[in-house]
Amino acid sequence: MARTPGPAPLCPGGGKAQLSSAFPPAAGLLLPAPTPPPLLLLLIPLLLFSRLCGALAGSIIVEPHVTAVWGKNVSLKCLIEVNETITQISWEKIHGKSTQTVAVHHPQYGFSVQGDYQGRVLFKNYSLNDATITLHNIGFSDSGKYICKAVTFPLGNAQSSTTVTVLVEPTVSLIKGPDSLIDGGNETVAAVCVAATGKPVAQIDWEGDLGEMESSTTSFPNETATIVSQYKLFPTRFARGRRITCVVKHPALEKDIRYSFILDIQYAPEVSVTGYDGNWFVGRKGVNLKCNADANPPPFKSVWSRLDGQWPDGLLASDNTLHFVHPLTVNYSGVYVCKVSNSLGQRSDQKVIYISDPPTTTTLQPTVQWHSSPADVQDIATEHKKLPFPLSTLATLKDDTIGTIIASVVGGALFLVLVSILAGVFCYRRRRTFRGDYFAKNYIPPSDMQKESQIDVLHQDELDSYPDSVKKENKNPVNNLIRKDYLEEPEKTQWNNVENLTRFERPMDYYEDLKMGMKFVSDERYNESEDGLVSHVDGSVISRREWYV
């Protein structure tokens, strides 16, 4: 029985590899089963077969992943580098488990585009080694897996695949918030940035650092999504004219999209009156007041008035300026008010105007050579002298002089009253200081080189008892002349007797034989009458001489 070889095996690309038997059997002969070849002889053909198929498959160069943008064009690259003869190249798209031919290039029959791709697919060139195509007007259905296939002879088919991802570029818009931004109002949406129907969803950021953002996203069945971002802030007039920027990022964009928005903050008028320099005097000309107003929306008009309701002649209001047509007089002194209003309210400002007297100026007469004559001398003698000052200035000087005199008199009187009060207080305090108790002072004897002073010495029985403080100091006195019976007596009832005050005097040498110590001047030294005594506030009577000791 003869054996026939089976079909040749196919390469993964469809090429067939021919295998032949090493010992073909002779016709009509029955031979024993051949001996299995060594393992190495079996591996060599298999290695050559897999090498040929792998070399053919790896020779088609494509991009594994391609990103396409909806509505735009995309190129699908396919380069074929083989040494075999290329008989045909084609592109196919995989739909589930089946494939759909997109385009075919045959060297003899030319180009062919199938189905919905007609008019949208073009080959880049006519070379069989470059199967790159351009797909126009990308739609959602164009996403998926595409195969670039090449048919060669004698090895058969070779192919590589690329995956196309369709992105949708978002539609970006920036609009003003629904509500007006009012100075001092609550948190308000200033601007809204929208990135609509993007695939995938876009990313929105804000620049400005004046508020905060709040975003929300909505998804759709076609895998697109819309993101809405609101920029909120607390409006203030100082933010007027500031710029905030919406920044949109998306993989389908070549660069970020940036939209800016200028904040429009509305506020009531801010009013100020200018033009008065504080030196408006009688007779001055060409002065005016200006009403400056800053408001958004712009103010309707400016209204001038005076606080006292008067409106002197010569005042002309033109737009925001008040003109003083005539030379200034004291009648123009007053408080001028400017009121400005817009749709958000009314504001005003006022300025106090004071018209002072004209400045005093002395004009020097030009020096002209003068020749005297008898008639001129007579005219000079009879001419009345004129003061170079106006009468109003003289009246002012007179008033100032009278005021100065009155102020001086009042000040002098107040000064005298103050001095009198101080003197009385001083005398009263001095009188209150002396209590009427007189204590003899310790007598300090002179040195050997000095003669003893002749002081009056009081008698011992004429002095009151010591106070406690003095007794402590003189507990054991030396040569103390105070009599013992005096110290033992608690009281001297005769001390306040006027008759006992008249004593005889002893000479100073009466005590010369005694040692010097604590001595008292006796009233024997004095011969005084009632006129020589002084009555004290506590009822005691003291000698005038003792008063001055």
Curated annotation (Swiss-Prot):
Ig-like V-type domain boundaries: 58-165
Leader sequence segment: 1-57
This protein's record includes keyword Mitochondrion: no
Coarse class of the protein's main subcellular location: membrane
Domain of life: Eukaryota
PANTHER family xrefs: NECTIN-3 (PTHR23277:SF12), NECTIN-RELATED (PTHR23277)
Protein's name according to its UniProt entry: Nectin-3
Source species: Mus musculus
Gene (UniProt): Nectin3
